[in-house]
């Protein structure tokens, strides 16, 4: 199952491209049906399943490639959906501040997640990282039921936002 590091792109590039291409249908559905929060919840569940499967199904390159594709679909949809929700929920005058706080906490989360993931992997093995991620996703999934679909802005195309 070993793939030399110089060939990792053989797996990652197709997974990233597939994830990018397949993120469009859920995003379009969420916008057209005013179901962005529903799509977000679905993708949180989608990633939870992916993390659990990562803990068990990393025996072949094909399994890894498939799971990476699943991961990147969920990740890309959430990466587009979350700032969208923040900008819709925040008052117009505070939208820039809200997005700044979002981006700052996102970067803090990258650091903390990387540090915790490394410590967990070192002490309990790589499978434990996936289980901890799945558990965190379940907490996020449960807490997402407090969210309501934000109102769609009522403005004409090309109208200046005030």
Show which residues each predicted segment covers:
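Helix-to-loop junctions at the C-terminal end of transmembrane segments
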Residues: 22-36, 121
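Loop-to-transmembrane helix entry/capping segments in MFS-fold secondary transporters
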Residues: 5, 92-102
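Intracellular juxtamembrane helix-capping segments at the cytosolic ends
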Residues: 77-90
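Structural signature of the two symmetry-related core transmembrane helices
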Residues: 38-53
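Multi-pass alpha-helical transporter architecture, strongest
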Residues: 133-162
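A membrane-interface helix-boundary motif in multi-pass transporters
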Residues: 119-137
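Helix-loop junctions at membrane interfaces in 12-TM secondary transporters
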Residues: 56-67
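Loop-to-transmembrane helix entry
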Residues: 2-18
């Amino acid at each position: 199952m070993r793939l030399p590091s110089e060939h990792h792109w053989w797996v990652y590039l197709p997974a990233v491209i597939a994830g990018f291409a397949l993120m469009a249908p859920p995003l379009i559905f969420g916008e057209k049906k005013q179901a962005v929060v529903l799509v977000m919840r679905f993708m949180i569940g989608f990633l939870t399943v992916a993390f659990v499967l990562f803990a068990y199904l990393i025996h072949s390159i094909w399994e890894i490639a498939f799971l990476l594709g699943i991961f990147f679909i969920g990740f890309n949809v959430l990466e587009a959906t979350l700032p969208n929700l923040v900008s819709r929920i925040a008052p117009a005058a505070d939208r820039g501040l809200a997005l700044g706080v979002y981006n700052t906490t996102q970067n803090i989360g990258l650091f903390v997640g990387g540090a915790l993931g490394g410590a967990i992997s070192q002490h309990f093995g790589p499978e434990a990282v996936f289980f901890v991620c799945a558990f965190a996703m379940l907490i996020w999934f449960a807490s997402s039921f407090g969210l309501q679909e934000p109102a769609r802005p009522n403005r004409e195309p090309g109208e200046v936002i005030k």
